[in-house]
């Protein structure tokens, strides 16, 4: 390691877990490419965080060991927000609106970044869900698209310089 260099390289490394299915499944690969792009935009500003690393590692292992699920990346992003410090405040989740900008529920529509009705119901379904519960989530493709759009917007509102995710278009074409 040379602190004066911007680009570092590995001389040798050893894999802790050998992936078995992700590289053989185009849908899984598309999701991983999407998540890699999102993580590359986020982690560049992060300090060492072993819990975050463990979360990412466990999520990838889970995804590799289980069959494809079209909700994995959405649940991943919501749970990732816990480690980034802006997980939604689930107090008052009985309210009519969720304010994406401020991260809380409200009965007052006083922001340009409010979700409600079907979008809010879908959003509520994924809060508190872990990967083992993915099988219980059923959303239509339109609901899934809207939910992912809202989560990406949520990230843009909470992470400075979070730009558009280019691989999102590819992901949408896959499923």
Task: Name what the model sees in each region.
Residues 1-175:
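Non-catalytic alpha-helical scaffolds and adjoining flexible linkers that form interface surfaces
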């Amino acid at each position: 390691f040379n602190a004066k260099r911007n680009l570092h390289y590995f001389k040798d490394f050893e894999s802790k877990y050998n992936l078995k299915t992700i590289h053989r499944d185009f849908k899984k690969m598309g999701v991983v490419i999407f998540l890699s792009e999102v993580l590359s935009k986020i982690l560049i500003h992060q300090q060492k965080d072993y819990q975050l690393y463990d979360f990412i590692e466990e999520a990838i292992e889970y995804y590799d060991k289980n069959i494809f699920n079209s909700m994995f990346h959405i649940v991943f992003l919501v749970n990732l927000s816990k480690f980034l410090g802006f997980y939604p405040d689930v107090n008052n989740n009985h309210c009519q609106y969720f304010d994406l900008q401020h991260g809380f529920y409200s009965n007052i529509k006083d922001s340009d970044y409010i979700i409600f009705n079907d979008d809010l119901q879908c959003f509520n379904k994924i809060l508190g869900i872990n990967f083992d519960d993915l099988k219980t989530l059923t959303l239509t493709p339109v609901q899934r698209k809207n939910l992912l759009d809202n989560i990406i917007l949520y990230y843009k509102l909470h992470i400075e310089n979070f730009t558009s995710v280019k691989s999102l278009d590819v992901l949408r074409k896959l499923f």
